[in-house]
Amino acid sequence: MGAGCVKVTKYFLFLFNLLFFILGAVILGFGVWILADKNSFISVLQTSSSSLQVGAYVFIGVGAITIVMGFLGCIGAVNEVRCLLGLYFVFLLLILIAQVTVGVLFYFNADKLKKEMGNTVMDIIRNYTANATSSREEAWDYVQAQVKCCGWVSHYNWTENEELMGFTKTTYPCSCEKIKEEDNQLIVKKGFCEADNSTVSENNPEDWPVNTEGCMEKAQAWLQENFGILLGVCAGVAVIELLGLFLSICLCRYIHSEDYSKVPKY
């Protein structure tokens, strides 16, 4: 390998690892966000889903390893330290294997995860109270108001709430209330609201002034719309990682051959 080519490879690998260092910080931050977030669907799930909490710690661990790996790769590439390049190669290979494993597990457990999410949401709906003081209830109110959905499958899921259905007048979950399209301001209401000019003597969900579409459909629609982007990002990261493996091997072999060329021959 020519000296010029080696120099280009070395500094390209340095730039690559600098980006990887930043990526590691982003992944670590994402894991911390999952644990700390209190106002989204993530918060609803993590309060009762051990799988999501484990996933958050995995993100934190992978992020930390990626940061260390990026640092080792930068030092190893600039100073041509073969040992550090070797460690970098091993770390990168392990991360690539882990990503493929997680992807396969997620694909084959998608139905199980969907069922777990549904059970979690329905548990919140059944036990929801007019005061809505728990973190799970507040988080679910935020989700319904932000996404403009109601219930998991539909607004009829709320008929399983005994307190709500015990009202004699038209009463509905406040966070499900249908807002005018021109009103872009997000207002998260809590508890149960009584419909204006309610004259009926029973609480019929047909009369609720709410969004009728369930949050499950909204989530599926979002995934379908952004599936191409998600797939492209994952494929791009995998290609970059494979390129990093290739460059580290090339530089490692060059350093190895250079070391042997300096040995005196008799």
UniProtKB/Swiss-Prot annotation:
Residue stretches spanning the membrane: 12-32, 54-72, 84-110, 228-249
Superkingdom of origin organism: Eukaryota
Tissue-level expression: Highest expression in the spleen and the kidney. Low expression in skeletal muscle and in the heart.
UniProt GO cellular component terms: phagocytic vesicle; plasma membrane
Keyword RNA-binding: no
Cytoplasmic side: 1-11, 73-83, 250-266
Gene3D superfamilies (alphabetical): Tetraspanin (1.10.1450.10)
Changes seen on gene knockout: Cd82-deletion mice are phenotypically normal. However, they display reduced bleed times and blood volume collection and an increase in platelet number. They also have increased retinal macrophage recruitment and exacerbated pathology. Cd82-deficient phagocytes infiltrate tissues in greater numbers in multiple disease models, and neutrophils also display enhanced migration.
Extracellular side: 33-53, 111-227
Positions of S-palmitoyl cysteine lipidation: C5, C74
Entry comment on modification after translation: Palmitoylated. Palmitoylation contributes to oligomerization and surface expression.
CDD domains, per database record: CD37_CD82_like_LEL
Glycosylated residues, chain numbering: N127, N131, N157, N197
Location(s) in or outside the cell: Cell membrane; Cytoplasmic vesicle, Phagosome
InterPro entries on file: Tetraspanin/Peripherin, Tetraspanin_animals, Tetraspanin_CS, Tetraspanin_EC2_sf
Keyword vocabulary terms for this entry: Cell membrane, Cytoplasmic vesicle, Glycoprotein, Lipoprotein, Membrane, Palmitate, Transmembrane, Transmembrane helix
This protein's record includes keyword Methyltransferase: no
Classification via Pfam families: Tetraspanin (PF00335)
Main location: membrane
Membrane-topology annotation of the record: Multi-pass membrane protein
UniProt function note: Structural component of specialized membrane microdomains known as tetraspanin-enriched microdomains (TERMs), which act as platforms for receptor clustering and signaling. Participates thereby in diverse biological functions such as cell signal transduction, adhesion, migration and protein trafficking. Acts as a attenuator of EGF signaling, facilitating ligand-induced endocytosis of the receptor and its subsequent desensitization. Mechanistically, modulates ligand-induced ubiquitination and trafficking of EGFR via E3 ligase CBL phosphorylation by PKC.
Family classification: Belongs to the tetraspanin (TM4SF) family.
Assembly and binders: Forms homooligomers. Interacts directly with IGSF8. Interacts with EGFR. Interacts with VEGFA and PDGFA. Interacts with ITGA4. Interacts with ITGA6; this interaction reduces ITGA6 cell surface expression. Interacts with ITGB1. Interacts with TLR4; this interaction inhibits TLR4-mediated signaling pathway. Interacts with TLR9. Interacts with PLAUR.
Protein name: CD82 antigen
Lineage summary: Eukaryota, Metazoa, Chordata, Craniata, Vertebrata
